[in-house]
Design a protein with these regions (language model features):
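Flexible, acidic/histidine-containing loops and adjacent segments that form or flank the divalent-metal
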Residues: 2-136
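Cap/insert and terminal regions of metallo-dependent hydrolase folds
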Residues: 2-22, 103, 108-112, 133-203
């Protein structure tokens, strides 16, 4: 078994989560400490591996059973934290800085640090990108738009999971135009999901 995390083992972007107790955003300190204890227990007692999400890799998530029979299957890691794969090797480009993320009174949101990946099998291609956002308005700086620079790296897909539970601050027009999915999956958990604006963009 393997556990993959966006910021293992340092957990220091945008702040040191091991010592962060200010409640300025992200995961609750008590919950994070419990996660660390869980991971240590699993490593020690059950041999579980813990790895950092390897941006650009198409080897980290691989078939376990008879992979040679499915040469067209691939999972490609596209984005994690503030780093986006360039499409070449393991090269990445930063989408925003720690300072930009913490600009509002030192508070931050984990959403923009979400991982993103693409699953391919033959002609089928599927995108999933967690809570990555794509909105720019009077309340959100340009860096908040993760989707527009990520779109050409992902390219056209067969199907996709709508970013941020299909919330109105994600799945922007640029992203939809480039990915051009035939099927979308909305992982809704609130009465305002999907956002009406997202619904209009999907029409």
């Amino acid at each position: 078994k393997t556990y993959v995390d966006r910021d293992y083992p340092n957990y220091n972007f945008p702040v040191d989560l091991r010592t962060n107790v200010s409640g300025n955003g992200g995961v609750e300190p008590a919950t994070f400490q419990n996660l660390l204890k869980f991971l240590e227990f699993q490593k020690t007692n059950n041999g579980m591996k813990v790895e950092k999400f390897d941006i650009g890799s198409n080897k980290q998530f691989a078939l376990k059973k008879d992979p040679k029979s499915y040469p067209g299957f691939e999972i490609r890691n596209i984005k994690s934290n503030n780093l986006l794969w360039t499409g070449k090797g393991k090269n990445t480009t930063p989408l925003f800085t720690k300072e930009e993320l913490l600009a509002k009174n030192g508070k931050f949101n984990d959403n923009q640090m979400s991982t993103a990946l693409v699953v391919k099998y033959g002609k089928f291609k599927y995108y999933a990108g967690g809570d990555n956002s794509g909105l720019v308005d009077q309340d959100h700086a340009e860096w908040y738009d993760i989707e527009t620079p990520m779109a050409p790296i992902v390219g056209k897909v067969s199907a996709m999971s709508l970013n941020h539970h299909s919330n109105r601050d994600a799945t922007n027009r640029n992203f939809l135009d480039v990915l051009d999915p035939k099927v979308v999956v909305a992982q809704s958990w609130s009465t305002d999901h999907p956002g009406s604006e997202v619904g209009q963009r999907l029409l």
